[in-house]
Amino acid sequence: MTQSLPDAAEQVAAAEKESALVRIIDDEIDVREALALMLRIEGWTAKTYPNARAFLIEDDVRRPGCLVLDVRMPLMTGLELQNEMLRRGLMLPTIFLTGHADIDVAVSSLKRGAVDFLIKPVNDEILLESIAAAVHCDFLRRAGVAGGEGGIRTFSLMPIKSKT
């Protein structure tokens, strides 16, 4: 029996979700814990870090997934981490999530390859859509599929429509 395209796509998405890791870096413990809980309820595996340096020391970026990153943090800002990741050749798709909206920072992060730039408090559905797209792009990039890396940059410039 042949599966329909939507069923096959759902299985691929489920397989990606099962093996992906969503890394959350935020200096506010309440934010980290709330995001991690929401992601786990939605079936994602999440790991939290209190700052960028802890992430750089502890994380295994060989595992596919994405990064949900606060902008303003002590020790190393989100933008500084993004720059350090680029310097090291770490290609993990990054979603910035901040309570401090700044157009210059948003544009700068997107130009450097961020997948998305979202403002706290963020709608859970919008964040989940952004995470799913980022993870999918990471799997494509790792598989060497055309559009994996470019798909991230294209997606970063597309607005996400609210479902409210």
Stretches found by the model and what they are:
Residues M73:
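Receiver (REC) domain active-site loop signature in two-component systems and cognate sites
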Residues D102-D104, V122-A132:
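C-terminal output helix
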Residues P50-N51, M76-L81, A101:
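Acidic catalytic/metal-coordinating carboxylates
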Residues I57, L79-L90, S108:
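Short amphipathic alpha-helix used as the core "switch/output" element in two-component signaling
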Residues R62-V68:
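Active-site beta3 strand of CheY-like receiver
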Residues M1-R23, I29, A36, N51, ...:
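Non-catalytic signal-transmission and effector/linker regions of two-component phosphorelay proteins
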